[in-house]
Amino acid sequence: MPKSGLVSSHRRFDCDLGVRQTPVTMANNPRHEFGGPWTEIKLDAISEYLWFYQQALKRKGFETWYVDAFAGTGERNAKVMKGGIFEEEPIEEVEAVLAGSAKRALSIDPPFSHYWFSEQRPTRVKALEALRNDYQSDIIVRQGDANEQLHILFSSAPWANDRDSWKQRAVVFLDPYGMSVGFDTLRLLAETKRVDVWYLFPRKAVIQQLANKASGIDDDKRASLNRIFGCDDWEERFYKAQPAQGSLFGDPVNPESVRMATGAEIAAFARERFGGIFAYVSDPLPLLINGRDFFELYCLSNNPPAIDLIKRGVEHVVKKYTPASHRRSAP
C-alpha cells in the first residue's frame, strides 16, 4: 500500500470489484514505452484477479506473494487521448505515464504480504527499487534472467525446505519479452502446487518462428521453439511432408515438409502442453492488434483444492474483458 500522504486523490475504484488504479501521472523514471490499447486490457484483467485473489485468501492465514518476473519500471509511457465534449477541450493525443503491473499490484487492497520483481536492465531495477520510497510493502527486487531468478525464488526458503512453506501462496505474472519463458520454468511453478500463473503466451512470436517450410527453421529458431514448448513434438504436429515430384528433367526430388498447422492449431498445441503440467488451464483472454491474435493471456494452476474458486474468478475476468479486447483491436 502507498505510504501515508502519498496516495493520489485521483485514484479511483472499479465499480465492480474495487480495484484501485493509478491514473496518468508524471514520473522521473527511465522511459518504458510498450504496448497499446490491449496493454490496458491485460493490466485491467490482472488487477481484477489480484483483487479477487486477495479477497478470497485474506482470512486463510497464508502469506501471499505477487511475483512479477518481467516487471519493467513499474509504469509505462503511452499516448492517450485527452479532451472532448465533456471536458470542453479539443481532442488531442498526449503522452502520459501510466501505472504498469507492479504499481497496480502495489495498489491492491488488501495488500499482498510480499512483492517480488525481477528485471535484467540496471535502470529498470533501480526504478523498481525506488518503489520502496512510495509504498510500505515488503518489496523484493532481483536483477537477472527471469527464468533463473524464479528458480532461485521457488527453490529457496520460505518456498522450499522451510517450516512455513505451507503458508506461501502466490500469483505469478509472466509477461515476457518475446519467447523468453522456458517450459522448464512453467514446470517448476506447477510443481509448487501453490501458485496461480498468469502467462501472456506470445502466439504471434511463435508463429513467426515457424517458417512455411521446415527447412527454413534454423538451429536458433528450433531451439527457441523447443524451449517454449518443452519438447520437439511441435515439428511433427505442425509440418507434413508433401509427396515427392520429379523435376523437369525426370529426376526425383526429396519431399519437403510444409507447415500445415493454422494459428488456432498452434495455440491449441500450446494449451495441450500447459495441460500436461497444470491441473487447470483457463480459456485464454485474446489480446488482438488490428483484429489479429498476437497474444493469449492464460491462468494456469496446479492446486486442485482451489481450482473451483480460481475458475470462478478467472471466468469472470475472461468474460468481462474479451469483448473489450475485440473492440479496441479494430484497425
Predicted feature locations:
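Basic, amphipathic N-terminal segments that precede the first structured/catalytic domain
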Residues: P2-D44
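SAM cofactor-binding core of SAM-dependent methyltransferases
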Residues: D44-I152
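Short amphipathic alpha-helix with an adjacent loop that forms part of the alpha/beta core around
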Residues: L150-S165, R187
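A short SAM/SAH-binding and catalytic strip from SAM-dependent methyltransferases
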Residues: A170-S180
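A short, conserved alpha-helix within the catalytic core of class I
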Residues: M179-L188
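Conserved beta-strand signature within the Rossmann-like core of class I S-adenosyl-L-methionine
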Residues: K193-A205
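A conserved mid-domain beta-alpha-beta active-site/ligand-binding segment of alpha/beta enzyme cores
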Residues: K213-V281
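C-terminal target-recognition/interaction regions appended to catalytic cores
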Residues: G291-P331
